[in-house]
Protein backbone atom coordinates (compact mmCIF):
# COMPACT_ATOMS: atom_id res chain seq x y z
CA UNK A 1 0.00 0.00 0.00
CA UNK A 2 1.10 3.62 -0.50
CA UNK A 3 1.22 4.31 3.22
CA UNK A 4 4.87 5.08 3.88
CA UNK A 5 5.92 1.44 3.77
CA UNK A 6 9.74 1.09 3.53
CA UNK A 7 9.25 -0.97 0.38
CA UNK A 8 8.07 2.01 -1.64
CA UNK A 9 8.44 5.75 -1.07
CA UNK A 10 5.43 7.05 -2.95
CA UNK A 11 6.40 10.68 -2.46
CA UNK A 12 9.37 10.12 -4.77
CA UNK A 13 7.55 8.04 -7.34
CA UNK A 14 7.55 9.01 -10.99
CA UNK A 15 6.95 6.86 -14.01
CA UNK A 16 9.98 6.39 -16.27
CA UNK A 17 10.20 8.74 -19.28
CA UNK A 18 7.77 7.91 -22.05
CA UNK A 19 8.99 7.50 -25.62
CA UNK A 20 8.97 10.66 -27.69
CA UNK A 21 6.00 9.54 -29.75
CA UNK A 22 3.83 9.56 -26.64
CA UNK A 23 3.96 13.37 -26.76
CA UNK A 24 2.32 13.44 -30.18
CA UNK A 25 -1.03 15.15 -30.45
CA UNK A 26 -4.24 13.33 -31.28
CA UNK A 27 -7.92 13.68 -30.29
CA UNK A 28 -7.24 11.27 -27.43
CA UNK A 29 -3.75 12.51 -26.57
CA UNK A 30 -3.45 16.33 -26.76
CA UNK A 31 -0.10 18.10 -26.72
CA UNK A 32 1.73 17.79 -23.41
CA UNK A 33 5.21 18.98 -22.51
CA UNK A 34 7.62 21.90 -22.37
CA UNK A 35 8.74 24.16 -25.19
CA UNK A 36 11.99 26.14 -25.10
CA UNK A 37 10.97 29.34 -26.91
CA UNK A 38 13.23 32.26 -27.82
CA UNK A 39 11.21 35.36 -27.03
CA UNK A 40 12.14 38.22 -29.37
CA UNK A 41 12.31 41.88 -28.39
CA UNK A 42 9.18 43.98 -28.61
CA UNK A 43 6.53 41.57 -27.36
CA UNK A 44 5.40 40.49 -23.91
CA UNK A 45 5.74 37.00 -22.47
CA UNK A 46 1.95 36.74 -22.62
CA UNK A 47 2.08 37.59 -26.34
CA UNK A 48 4.17 34.44 -26.81
CA UNK A 49 1.52 32.38 -25.03
CA UNK A 50 -1.25 33.96 -27.13
CA UNK A 51 0.56 33.16 -30.39
CA UNK A 52 1.10 29.55 -29.34
CA UNK A 53 -2.56 29.22 -28.40
CA UNK A 54 -3.54 30.35 -31.89
CA UNK A 55 -0.95 28.08 -33.48
CA UNK A 56 -1.86 24.93 -31.53
CA UNK A 57 -5.57 25.60 -30.88
CA UNK A 58 -4.81 24.72 -27.26
CA UNK A 59 -5.92 27.02 -24.46
CA UNK A 60 -3.96 25.36 -21.66
CA UNK A 61 -0.57 27.04 -22.19
CA UNK A 62 1.52 29.02 -19.73
CA UNK A 63 5.04 30.37 -19.23
CA UNK A 64 7.53 30.70 -16.40
CA UNK A 65 9.92 33.54 -15.63
CA UNK A 66 8.41 36.64 -17.25
CA UNK A 67 10.67 38.62 -19.60
CA UNK A 68 10.10 42.36 -20.06
CA UNK A 69 9.06 43.42 -23.59
CA UNK A 70 12.50 44.87 -24.40
CA UNK A 71 14.24 41.69 -23.20
CA UNK A 72 14.79 38.58 -25.29
CA UNK A 73 15.92 35.00 -24.91
CA UNK A 74 14.84 31.78 -23.23
CA UNK A 75 11.18 31.61 -22.17
CA UNK A 76 10.10 28.15 -20.94
CA UNK A 77 6.57 27.29 -22.07
CA UNK A 78 4.30 24.65 -20.53
CA UNK A 79 1.66 23.06 -22.75
CA UNK A 80 -1.37 20.99 -21.78
CA UNK A 81 -1.29 19.35 -18.38
CA UNK A 82 2.38 20.31 -18.14
CA UNK A 83 1.09 23.69 -16.90
CA UNK A 84 0.58 21.95 -13.56
CA UNK A 85 4.38 21.70 -13.33
CA UNK A 86 5.09 25.44 -13.62
CA UNK A 87 5.74 25.78 -9.90
CA UNK A 88 8.57 23.24 -10.16
CA UNK A 89 10.50 25.30 -12.72
CA UNK A 90 12.24 27.50 -10.16
CA UNK A 91 15.83 26.98 -11.23
CA UNK A 92 18.48 29.68 -11.50
CA UNK A 93 18.60 31.98 -14.51
CA UNK A 94 21.51 33.29 -16.57
CA UNK A 95 21.54 36.61 -18.40
CA UNK A 96 23.75 38.70 -20.65
CA UNK A 97 23.04 42.31 -19.73
CA UNK A 98 24.23 45.50 -21.42
CA UNK A 99 24.46 48.46 -19.05
CA UNK A 100 24.66 52.10 -20.11
CA UNK A 101 26.50 54.42 -17.72
CA UNK A 102 25.91 58.17 -17.46
CA UNK A 103 22.18 58.22 -16.72
CA UNK A 104 19.61 56.59 -14.46
CA UNK A 105 15.97 56.15 -15.50
CA UNK A 106 12.60 55.76 -13.77
CA UNK A 107 12.21 52.17 -14.97
CA UNK A 108 15.89 51.26 -14.61
CA UNK A 109 15.97 50.50 -18.35
CA UNK A 110 15.98 52.34 -21.68
CA UNK A 111 12.18 52.73 -21.74
CA UNK A 112 11.95 55.07 -18.75
CA UNK A 113 12.46 58.80 -18.28
CA UNK A 114 15.88 60.01 -17.20
CA UNK A 115 15.98 60.77 -13.48
CA UNK A 116 19.71 61.46 -13.19
CA UNK A 117 22.58 62.27 -15.55
CA UNK A 118 26.30 62.52 -14.97
CA UNK A 119 29.48 63.45 -16.82
CA UNK A 120 31.47 61.00 -14.73
CA UNK A 121 33.30 58.45 -16.86
CA UNK A 122 33.77 54.98 -15.43
CA UNK A 123 36.63 52.66 -16.32
CA UNK A 124 36.77 48.94 -16.89
CA UNK A 125 38.49 48.59 -13.53
CA UNK A 126 35.71 50.59 -11.85
CA UNK A 127 33.08 48.21 -13.21
CA UNK A 128 35.00 45.07 -12.25
CA UNK A 129 35.44 46.39 -8.71
CA UNK A 130 31.82 47.53 -8.54
CA UNK A 131 30.47 44.11 -9.48
CA UNK A 132 32.10 42.53 -6.44
CA UNK A 133 29.43 43.99 -4.15
CA UNK A 134 26.77 41.92 -5.92
CA UNK A 135 28.36 38.52 -5.36
CA UNK A 136 26.56 35.93 -3.21
CA UNK A 137 23.36 36.63 -1.27
CA UNK A 138 22.35 40.27 -1.48
CA UNK A 139 19.42 42.43 -0.41
CA UNK A 140 17.84 43.91 -3.53
CA UNK A 141 15.24 46.64 -3.89
CA UNK A 142 12.92 45.83 -6.85
CA UNK A 143 12.16 48.59 -9.40
CA UNK A 144 9.03 50.65 -8.76
CA UNK A 145 8.02 49.69 -12.31
CA UNK A 146 7.52 45.99 -11.60
CA UNK A 147 4.62 43.57 -11.16
CA UNK A 148 5.31 42.87 -7.49
CA UNK A 149 2.14 43.36 -5.45
CA UNK A 150 1.95 45.53 -2.34
CA UNK A 151 -1.40 45.73 -0.54
CA UNK A 152 -3.15 44.15 -3.51
CA UNK A 153 -1.75 46.54 -6.12
CA UNK A 154 1.17 46.09 -8.48
CA UNK A 155 4.08 48.45 -7.94
CA UNK A 156 3.86 49.90 -11.45
CA UNK A 157 0.26 50.93 -10.70
CA UNK A 158 1.50 53.05 -7.81
CA UNK A 159 4.17 54.52 -10.08
CA UNK A 160 1.75 55.41 -12.86
CA UNK A 161 -0.60 57.09 -10.38
CA UNK A 162 2.28 58.96 -8.69
CA UNK A 163 1.39 57.30 -5.40
CA UNK A 164 3.99 56.67 -2.75
CA UNK A 165 4.52 53.11 -1.58
CA UNK A 166 7.08 51.44 0.63
CA UNK A 167 9.09 48.83 -1.26
CA UNK A 168 10.59 46.06 0.81
CA UNK A 169 14.04 44.70 -0.13
CA UNK A 170 14.27 41.05 -1.08
CA UNK A 171 17.01 38.48 -0.63
CA UNK A 172 18.39 37.09 -3.89
CA UNK A 173 21.48 35.08 -4.72
CA UNK A 174 23.98 36.08 -7.39
CA UNK A 175 25.90 32.91 -8.13
CA UNK A 176 28.07 34.48 -10.80
CA UNK A 177 28.59 38.01 -12.09
CA UNK A 178 31.43 39.06 -14.38
CA UNK A 179 32.29 41.70 -16.93
CA UNK A 180 32.40 40.25 -20.45
CA UNK A 181 33.28 43.43 -22.33
CA UNK A 182 33.54 47.19 -21.81
CA UNK A 183 33.33 50.04 -24.31
CA UNK A 184 35.04 53.06 -22.76
CA UNK A 185 33.92 55.47 -25.49
CA UNK A 186 30.24 54.47 -25.33
CA UNK A 187 30.39 53.85 -21.57
CA UNK A 188 28.68 50.49 -21.97
CA UNK A 189 29.37 47.24 -20.15
CA UNK A 190 28.28 43.74 -21.10
CA UNK A 191 27.80 41.67 -17.95
CA UNK A 192 27.11 37.96 -17.46
CA UNK A 193 24.86 37.23 -14.47
CA UNK A 194 23.75 33.88 -13.06
CA UNK A 195 21.18 34.38 -10.34
CA UNK A 196 18.30 32.98 -8.35
CA UNK A 197 14.65 33.27 -9.28
CA UNK A 198 13.20 36.71 -8.59
CA UNK A 199 16.37 38.68 -9.26
CA UNK A 200 15.86 41.97 -11.08
CA UNK A 201 18.70 42.61 -13.51
CA UNK A 202 17.41 46.16 -13.94
CA UNK A 203 18.05 46.77 -10.25
CA UNK A 204 21.60 45.46 -10.57
CA UNK A 205 22.25 47.91 -13.43
CA UNK A 206 20.71 50.80 -11.51
CA UNK A 207 22.48 50.02 -8.25
CA UNK A 208 25.84 49.55 -10.00
CA UNK A 209 25.57 52.99 -11.56
CA UNK A 210 24.52 54.51 -8.26
CA UNK A 211 27.44 52.89 -6.43
CA UNK A 212 29.88 54.25 -9.01
CA UNK A 213 28.32 57.73 -8.88
CA UNK A 214 27.70 57.80 -12.62
CA UNK A 215 24.14 56.53 -12.87
CA UNK A 216 23.26 53.60 -15.12
CA UNK A 217 20.38 51.75 -16.72
CA UNK A 218 19.83 48.56 -18.66
CA UNK A 219 19.71 48.89 -22.45
CA UNK A 220 19.72 45.23 -23.50
CA UNK A 221 18.93 41.94 -21.81
CA UNK A 222 19.23 38.40 -23.12
CA UNK A 223 18.26 35.42 -20.99
CA UNK A 224 20.69 32.70 -22.00
CA UNK A 225 19.52 30.00 -19.60
CA UNK A 226 16.61 29.10 -17.33
CA UNK A 227 17.36 25.93 -15.40
CA UNK A 228 17.85 23.20 -18.01
CA UNK A 229 16.52 25.38 -20.83
CA UNK A 230 19.47 26.73 -22.84
CA UNK A 231 19.48 29.42 -25.50
CA UNK A 232 21.37 27.16 -27.91
CA UNK A 233 18.41 24.77 -27.99
CA UNK A 234 15.63 27.36 -28.06
CA UNK A 235 13.23 27.67 -31.00
CA UNK A 236 12.05 30.82 -32.75
CA UNK A 237 8.39 31.74 -32.57
CA UNK A 238 7.45 31.46 -36.25
CA UNK A 239 4.11 30.64 -37.86
CA UNK A 240 5.62 27.44 -39.27
CA UNK A 241 6.96 26.29 -35.89
CA UNK A 242 6.36 22.55 -35.44
CA UNK A 243 5.36 22.58 -31.79
CA UNK A 244 4.91 18.82 -31.55
CA UNK A 245 8.38 18.15 -32.98
CA UNK A 246 10.02 20.48 -30.46
CA UNK A 247 8.13 19.39 -27.35
CA UNK A 248 10.29 18.33 -24.42
CA UNK A 249 9.31 15.57 -22.02
CA UNK A 250 8.93 17.19 -18.55
CA UNK A 251 10.76 14.27 -16.92
CA UNK A 252 13.93 15.39 -18.71
CA UNK A 253 13.74 18.91 -17.27
CA UNK A 254 12.62 18.44 -13.67
CA UNK A 255 14.93 17.50 -10.82
CA UNK A 256 12.46 15.15 -9.19
CA UNK A 257 13.58 11.90 -7.61
CA UNK A 258 12.25 8.91 -9.52
CA UNK A 259 11.71 5.22 -8.96
CA UNK A 260 11.62 2.83 -11.88
CA UNK A 261 9.09 0.02 -11.57
CA UNK A 262 8.15 -2.90 -13.77
CA UNK A 263 4.68 -3.47 -15.21
CA UNK A 264 3.55 -5.67 -12.32
CA UNK A 265 4.61 -3.12 -9.71
CA UNK A 266 3.02 -0.31 -11.72
CA UNK A 267 -0.31 -2.14 -11.78
CA UNK A 268 -0.16 -2.59 -8.00
CA UNK A 269 0.45 1.12 -7.55
CA UNK A 270 -2.47 1.95 -9.83
CA UNK A 271 -4.65 -0.31 -7.71
CA UNK A 272 -3.49 1.35 -4.51
CA UNK A 273 -1.58 -1.67 -3.26
Where are these regions (language model features)?
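Glycine/acidic-rich beta-strand-loop module
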Residues: 60-90, 157
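Residue-level signal for inorganic ion chemistry
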Residues: 77, 97, 152, 204, ...
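Short, structured patches in soluble enzyme cores that scaffold and shape functional sites
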Residues: 99-101, 160, 176-181, 193-197, ...
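The conserved catalytic core of RNA pseudouridine synthases
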Residues: 54-58, 72, 76, 165-213
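Extended alpha-helical targeting/anchoring segments
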Residues: 146, 150-175
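Acidic, low-complexity central loop/insert segments
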Residues: 88-139
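Structural signature of FAD isoalloxazine-binding scaffolds in flavoprotein oxidoreductases
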Residues: 86-101, 165-179
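Accessory RNA 3′-end/elbow-binding domains used by RNA modification enzymes
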Residues: 2-40, 44-67, 74, 125-128, ...
Amino acid sequence: MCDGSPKLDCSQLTVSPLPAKSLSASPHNPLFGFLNVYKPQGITSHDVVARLRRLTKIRQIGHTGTLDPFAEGVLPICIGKATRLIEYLNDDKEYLATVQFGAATSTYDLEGDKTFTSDIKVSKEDVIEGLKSFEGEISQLPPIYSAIKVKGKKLYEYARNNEEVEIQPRKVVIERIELKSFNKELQQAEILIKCSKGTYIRSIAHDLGENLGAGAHLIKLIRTQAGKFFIEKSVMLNDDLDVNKNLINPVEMLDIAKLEVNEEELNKIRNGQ
